[in-house]
Amino acid sequence: MEENCDSTENPHSQGRQNATKCGWLRKQGGFVKTWHTRWFVLKGDQLHYFKDEDETKPLGTIFLPGNKVIEHPCNEESPGKFLFEVVPGGERDRMTANHESYLLMASTQNDMEDWVKSIRRVIWGPFGGGIFGQKLEDTVRYEKRYGNRLAPMLVEQCVDFIRQRGLKEEGLFRLPGQANLVKELQDAFDCGEKPSFDSNTDVHTVASLLKLYLRELPEPVVPYAKYEDFLSCATLLSKEEEAGVKELTKQVKSLPVVNYNLLKYICRFLDEVQSYSGVNKMSAQNLATVFGPNILRPKVEDPLTIMEGTVVVQQLMSVMISKHDRLFPKDTEPQSKPQEGPNSNNNDGHKKVTMGQLQNKENNNTKESPVRRCSWDKPESPQRSSMDNGSPTALSGSKTNSPRNSIHKLDVSRSPPLTVKKNPAFNKGSGIVTNGSFSSSNAEGVEKTQTTPNGSLQARRTSSLKSSGTKMGTHSVQNGTVRMGILNTDTLGNSLNGRSMSWLPNGYVTLRDNKQKEPAGESGQHNRLSTYDNVHQQFSLMNLDDKHSVDSATWSTSSCEISLPENSNSCRSSTTTCPEQDFYGGNFEDPVLDGPPQDDLSHPGDYENKSDRRSVGGRSSRATSSSDNSETFVGNTSSNHSALHSLVSSLKQEMTKQKIEYESRIKSLEQRNLTLETEMLNLHDELDQERKKFTMIEIKMRNAERAKEDAEKRNDMLQKEMEQFFSTFGDLTVEPRRSERGNTIWIQ
């Protein structure tokens, strides 16, 4: 009863060589509703039926667009009838090409289901439905309008639901789901609907739906042509595993793109499922037993072939699940998601770097040239506390390495206190930059928080703190001292325990001990950190004999932020973003940098008093060193400006690329919109024509009914006239006979 009409073996099938399906069905028709056996051919969006298989002229045609297919359950009275009906669409305002229903009967249940699936695929295919039994490349081609995907949306939806709710479900993929629910979901997807799974949906039902989709693909994920090649890989695996894996990788790469992507997606998901085998009892072998026949199956499914290949297929599928990292390398993974822009904030995207990775990057950090993004975290406990007792060491030597001395002062009178928080990561040789503050810790792991009183910045400030407008450039740290925005005892006496700091490309900081330690009297000879992008500046100390080589690294981002304490009364916003124009255009006061080289502070009050005195006498010190500052800064300005120009040009190029990409997308969407509008206009015109036809047919039907009523009336009148005629004719014939009998002459 069922045939695929793709071949042209007999001459009569040449006109139907592009038919999707053909076979014998029984059709109910005529006024008496009798059953007639007809040869049906499904071609395009039309279902033709012929009197015989060899006929070329169809007896009729059913136009499928706008219709729907309904399956009739088997009745107990007629168990041998497998009925389905093609009826017009359920919407009243939706007119179809034919205004009548067709009741068809198949010989078997499987035959009926195949016909229903094929007809639904034709009806709902243009609307994204009919995916069960549809070719994989056709499904992927249609879903490309929604973006590039590794797997069809049905597979992704099932996998995402199982990831969320079913990875720990015992017997996953082994226990069957509810058959009626699976059937309902299948019909919904085939009708172009997109049903969503909620918390009440059974996990086993969704798993059964996924297996059903893979099982009903016209050609499995591994095509029929590759079946024998994959089986040979399994044979090679049993002899020599390494050679077998290489051959299997070669065969996997030779698959079509859509098949390769789907196989990779499924194998990675199944590997994730088997990682929970201690809970769900589904090991790689069990999953291979379930999915093997759906992924790898022969074209001719005779019992002997299936029996011979079952064990081999299970072994091969188990290898593909457990060794999917080698079979599907990540470097060949297509980009299915848009890349993040250079200014995107990826706070949640950064993975924590292990200690070994930090040390490896620390040893090679001078060779790190790519510009990376830096992640900023909100300070955990911005509390006010007194500074540690100690004597801060002021700067001595040249201060011309910073452009601060040749620009206007930055007014920070309204700035809330910044926070420098101790962090145990310093003991391990690493640190974290958090919203303009550097986290460190002492040897005892005591957590300390230091703030400046009255919301004013009265301490030394690095580029990462001072600029909250720092343009994320190259920072060189001399003699193992980290220049912080807030003074504490660790930076004064030990210079952060004699460790050198380097900024890694991912925004983290590593500290390590120097081989040489500077004398106590020279601990204050440091250079300011550079505030520019991608510029490796050379700094010189007053004493050239004490110069040490340090590591430098590059880190960059569009802007940096300083997080303000929530209990600050003077802050107007939670974060302050400082672009480069704020850095150059603002006024800045740094009494510590402008003060004398050596001062001792024992209490925060003394610190404030001395900083006030420095602010008075700082101008004279600036005047004496202005000539030195101008000479060095002129040389740095050109390189800094060139670096900024290169950064701006690269950002402009990136913006141009994004603009071109967005414009192309907009044009494609506009073109698609015009196409859809044209289709809508055509459909409206067709709808109007069909309505007019329907109106004409209604008029004809009413005329026919009136003519029928008139004919019945005439028939009644004729019937009465005939009865009267026969009754009158009978009376006329009976009376003459009676008169003749009365005139009889008797002869004796």
UniProtKB/Swiss-Prot annotation:
Interacts with FLNA. The modification Phosphoserine is found at residues 369, 391, 396, 398, 402, 413, 415, 437, 495. Pfam families: PH (PF00169), RhoGAP (PF00620). It comes from Rattus norvegicus (Rat). It is found in: Cytoplasm, Cytoskeleton; Cell junction, Adherens junction; Cell junction, Focal adhesion; Cell projection. Its main location: cytoplasm. The keyword Nucleotide-binding does not apply. Residues 617-630 have a biased composition (Low complexity). Residues 369-381, 600-615 have a biased composition (Basic and acidic residues). Residues 18-124 form the PH domain. Keywords: Angiogenesis, Cell junction, Cell projection, Coiled coil, Cytoplasm, Cytoskeleton, Developmental protein, Differentiation, GTPase activation, Phosphoprotein. The modification Phosphothreonine is found at residue 452. The gene is Arhgap24. One of its GO terms (cellular component) is cell projection. This is Rho GTPase-activating protein 24. One of its GO terms (molecular function) is GTPase activator activity.
